């Protein structure tokens, strides 16, 4: 379903509340339109899809009757205009009470969701036109501009003209293309045995640290034994929670047109507050996360999807998925294994990442580039170089096939689509990779304990020679079957 707008759209965002069906759209005229799509969700799924083009053999009466009775499944609540310049980006706050928007005149605005009135404004606070805006929580907002500068704002300090941000990062030299805040980004794993062999001093330091850690554990154990019996039962749980918290971290992941990706710690400042990847020799345009933030998918100008693993560090990608004929300008996560890609050729594709496979096309913008996409539950909203926003029903992809028999469930492949065969080759690869990582960690422990013995090094060297044999995995040759949801591909 296409919702007409007064001018071309530049960005859009869904309301964060699950029971509130609101969509905010930022226009090139500087206006913000708030749209309610309750009727779209309550209508049957058959009426959400566009009508098929009439054939030459169809009668004129049937065509005219279909055109004369259009179904309006949306309501425009209000139109607000914080600035006369174009609205280059907008995003709901974490609670949905306000809408943060950025304009070409280097300003930031906060608009009340209920009334559409501007509550706070930060006038001319950027050196260049801002390109992205992202609220981190109810009081902190992050913006990125065309010069590659990332700024952190505190809403509690109020707005005004020329106000300075709380923190600022200038390690990028080209425009900020996309940002995502991950509260549970995995911590990089320790170095492998091969890297540990390069320096004997590192082994000594690690062995000394291990001894100090054991002493601290023994000291803590003695303290726990002296405490009362009622506190002894609660302390192990608190220790487990602390151990779990150490395994993850909160970071802002930023992609830039300079070909690099960076991880920013918003709670600190200085040169140690961010990590920047190597030059990817291509513009990074979009980013999304899958598998509970253990994998990052980045879209590039050349149409290649690059995969990043935070547990291995964010200095470089670990894999690449080619196949798009044009640039991937926007990305949306569908499930743990699948993403939706919006390309400059006007098509919205369903791409399975693990294993990599093109599942089909679910929407088209008639050859015009897909600039932005957002997804909420079973609704996908996308905009291109037109004065309309397209709503696509994702229920066929997310359907669990509860009404179908067990035979259909057995034949259903990825995303529950009948006719798409499952491919577990990548799962096997991941299991093998995990086994290899576990083997490397075990070898590291063996070498640390036996660093003073010459025989221990010889045994670990033999184990390292056997590791490449365990990494050989036969690639799967499975292909998607015909007759599924995307039978025309």
Swiss-Prot record:
WD repeats lie at residues 4-45, 124-163, 279-318, 323-363. The keyword Metal-binding does not apply. One of its GO terms (cellular component) is nucleolus. Residues 46-66, 192-246, 417-489 are annotated as: Disordered. This is WD repeat-containing protein JIP5. PROSITE patterns: WD_REPEATS_1, WD_REPEATS_2, WD_REPEATS_REGION. InterPro entries: WD40/YVTN_repeat-like_dom_sf, WD40_repeat_CS, WD40_repeat_dom_sf, WD40_rpt, WDR55_POC1. Residues 232-241, 421-440, 449-472 have a biased composition (Acidic residues). It comes from the Eukaryota. Keywords: Nucleus, Repeat, WD repeat. Residues 199-210 have a biased composition (Basic residues). The keyword Ribonucleoprotein does not apply. It comes from Mycosarcoma maydis. Residues 211-227 have a biased composition (Basic and acidic residues). Belongs to the WD repeat WDR55 family. It is found in: Nucleus, Nucleolus.
């Amino acid at each position: 379903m296409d919702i007409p707008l007064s001018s071309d759209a530049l960005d859009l965002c869904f309301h964060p509340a699950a029971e509130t069906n609101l969509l905010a759209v930022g226009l090139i005229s500087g206006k913000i339109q708030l749209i309610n799509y309750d009727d779209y969700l309550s209508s049957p799924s058959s009426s959400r899809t566009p009508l098929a083009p009439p054939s030459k053999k169809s009668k004129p009466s049937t065509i005219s009757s279909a055109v004369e009775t259009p179904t309006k499944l949306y309501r425009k609540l209000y139109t607000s205009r914080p600035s006369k310049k174009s609205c280059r980006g907008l995003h709901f706050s974490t609670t949905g009470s306000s809408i943060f928007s950025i304009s070409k005149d280097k300003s930031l605005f906060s608009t009340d969701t209920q009334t559409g009135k501007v509550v706070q404004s930060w006038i001319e606070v950027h050196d260049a036109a801002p390109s992205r805006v992202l609220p981190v929580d109810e009081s902190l907002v992050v913006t990125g501009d065309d010069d590659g500068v990332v700024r952190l704002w505190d809403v509690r300090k109020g707005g005004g003209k020329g106000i300075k941000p709380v923190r600022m990062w200038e390690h990028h030299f080209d425009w900020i293309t996309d940002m995502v805040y991950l509260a549970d980004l995995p911590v990089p794993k320790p170095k492998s045995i091969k890297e540990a062999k390069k320096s004997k001093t590192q082994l000594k330091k690690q062995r000394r640290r291990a001894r100090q850690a054991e002493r601290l554990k023994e000291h803590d154990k003695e303290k726990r034994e002296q405490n009362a019996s009622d506190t002894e039962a609660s302390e192990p749980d608190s220790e487990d929670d602390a151990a779990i918290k150490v395994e993850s971290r909160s970071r802002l992941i930023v992609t830039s047109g300079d070909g690099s990706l960076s991880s920013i710690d918003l709670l600190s400042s200085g040169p140690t507050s961010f990590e920047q990847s190597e030059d990817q020799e291509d513009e990074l345009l979009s980013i999304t996360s899958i598998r509970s933030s253990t994998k990052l998918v980045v879209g590039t100008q050349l149409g290649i999807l690059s995969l990043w693993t935070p547990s291995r560090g964010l200095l470089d990608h670990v894999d690449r998925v080619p196949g798009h004929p044009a640039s991937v300008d926007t990305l949306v996560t569908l499930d743990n294994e699948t993403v939706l890609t919006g390309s400059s050729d006007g098509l919205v594709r369903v791409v399975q990442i693990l294993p990599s496979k093109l599942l089909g096309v679910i929407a088209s913008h008639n050859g015009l580039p897909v600039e932005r996409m957002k997804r909420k539950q079973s609704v996908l909203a996308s905009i291109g170089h037109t004065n309309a926003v397209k709503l696509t029903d994702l229920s066929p992809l997310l359907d669990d096939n509860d009404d179908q028999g067990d035979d259909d469930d057995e034949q259903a492949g990825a995303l529950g689509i009948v006719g798409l065969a499952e491919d577990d080759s990548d799962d096997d690869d991941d299991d093998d990779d995990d086994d290899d990582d576990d083997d490397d960690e075990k070898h590291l422990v063996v070498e640390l304990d036996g660093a003073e013995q010459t025989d221990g090094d010889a045994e670990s060297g033999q184990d390292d020679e056997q590791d490449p044999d365990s990494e050989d995995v036969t690639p799967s040759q499975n292909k998607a079957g015909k007759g599924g949801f995307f039978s025309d591909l």
